[in-house]
Structures are given as C-alpha cells and as structure tokens.
Amino acid sequence: MSAYRYANLTNTKYIPSVYAVMATAGCDDRKIKRKEKGKRHAAPLSLMGVHKR
C-alpha cells in the first residue's frame, strides 16, 4: 500500500482519514489514492519511490 506509506511519511494528520478509507473500501489502494488527490496534489508514483529512500 504505497499510498498509505506515502501519507505516513509526509503528513501525519492525513492518517486518520486513511484508516477511515481503509475501513470503508476494504484496503482498496485505488480508492485511497483517489482520496489523496482530494486532500492535496497527489505525488506521482516515481516521486513516492524517491520519498521512500
């Protein structure tokens, strides 16, 4: 779940909404990414790899 890890690294305030989405969507990664786009400008996957280093 790269979107959850990305949210965990960048924005701690975003984590409760991630948990809520996981509970409703059943750990559907695509729905989490869609929610992330609503919160802020979602980073492309290549940038996520850079953040994880």
Swiss-Prot record:
Region (Disordered) residue spans: 34-53
Organism whose genome encodes this protein: Treponema pallidum (strain Nichols)
Entry superkingdom: Bacteria
Protein name in the entry: Uncharacterized protein TP_0871
